């Protein structure tokens, strides 16, 4: 038990270290933590020619986004044919390359099923990669409740920081239930609130955040991502409420006028500029 408690403290320490603006962000909304999500599980070059698919493209995009102000990257890797992958070898190779090319950039791996992988495969990925940070959908883990304790216990034991993916208030309620039961461990409190995932046309709006705020703003740390041309408007709204932000081609390819961003770095830079302008 003591070992798990020590590792839980390491998760808290990692959060403090990886959020250089953690304290200031509550005061200065121009500087929330920014996590770039450059590709996702499904989009390809046919969706945008600058969407990174290969290892070299992912590494170059991560470095470019770091250079313009992103603090971390939400990492998806692909098979040779471009399909979504949870292959540990591909993850480890890509993580090493990003660390070499963009030192100081936080790396969060996804465990997204994307209709391809079961919970056992997601758990195996976590064990084999042993990442510093991983995003995990409570909805996906609930497909096999018998493995839920192992998923979160593994992360606690190996020092993997968890960000819970929440698509709606039912997911939030499930997370709270698992926390009360001790399935989700102490210190595993980070949440990503996904706005408009199931909205018509998958178009997010700032008001999509409201259901998550019925009991006030979430306990730190919380982050928001949003789909479609109002992506930056949604993120700016979240920043003013104290949230951190996930931005990139996984969720949005264009600005509010439906003009495509040149690349992920352009979207990150525009968001940062908008945030600074809003508090100027």
Task: Annotate each predicted stretch with a short phrase.
Residues 24-50:
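N-terminal small/glycine-rich loop or linker at the start of catalytic domains
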Residues 36, 55, 83-110, 154-159, ...:
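Alpha-helix-loop-beta-strand connector modules within alpha/beta enzyme cores
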Residues 36, 59, 68, 72-82, ...:
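Histidine-centered catalytic micro-motifs
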Residues 40-57, 110-119, 140-141, 200-201, ...:
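Active-site mouth loops of central-metabolism enzymes
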Residues 46, 71-94, 253-256:
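Glycine-rich, proline-tolerant flexible connector loops at the mouths of alpha/beta enzymes
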Residues 55-60, 82-145:
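Active-site beta->alpha loop and helix N-cap motifs at the rims of alpha/beta catalytic domains
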Residues 67-70, 104, 131, 242-243:
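A structural motif
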Residues 133-249, 260-266:
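Catalytic alpha/beta core domains of metabolic enzymes, predominantly
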């Amino acid at each position: 038990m003591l070992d798990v408690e020590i590792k839980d403290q390491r998760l808290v320490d990692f959060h403090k270290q990886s959020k250089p603006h953690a304290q200031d962000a509550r005061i200065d909304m121009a500087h929330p933590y920014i996590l770039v999500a450059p590709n996702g599980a499904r989009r390809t070059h046919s969706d945008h020619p600058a969407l990174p698919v290969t290892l070299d493209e992912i590494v170059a995009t991560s470095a470019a986004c770091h250079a313009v102000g992103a603090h971390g990257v939400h990492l998806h890797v692909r098979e040779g044919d471009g399909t979504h992958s949870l292959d540990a070898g591909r993850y480890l190779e890509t993580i090493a390359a990003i660390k070499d090319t963009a030192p100081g950039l936080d790396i969060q791996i996804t465990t997204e099923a994307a209709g391809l992988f079961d919970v056992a495969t997601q758990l195996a990925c976590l064990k084999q990669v042993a990442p510093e940070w991983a995003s995990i959908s409570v909805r996906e883990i609930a497909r096999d409740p018998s493995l839920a304790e192992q998923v979160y216990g593994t992360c606690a034991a190996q020092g993997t920081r968890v960000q819970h993916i929440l698509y709606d208030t039912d997911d939030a309620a499930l997370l709270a239930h698992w926390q009360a039961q001790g399935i989700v461990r102490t210190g595993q409190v980070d949440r990503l609130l996904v706005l408009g995932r199931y909205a018509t046309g998958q178009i997010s709006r700032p008001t999509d955040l409201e259901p998550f705020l019925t009991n006030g703003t979430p306990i730190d740390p919380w982050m928001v991502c949003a789909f479609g041309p109002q992506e930056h408007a949604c993120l700016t709204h979240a920043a003013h409420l104290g949230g951190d932000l996930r931005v990139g081609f996984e969720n949005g390819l264009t600005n509010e006028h439906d003009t495509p961003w040149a690349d992920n770095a352009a979207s990150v830079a525009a968001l940062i500029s908008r945030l600074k302008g809003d508090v100027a």
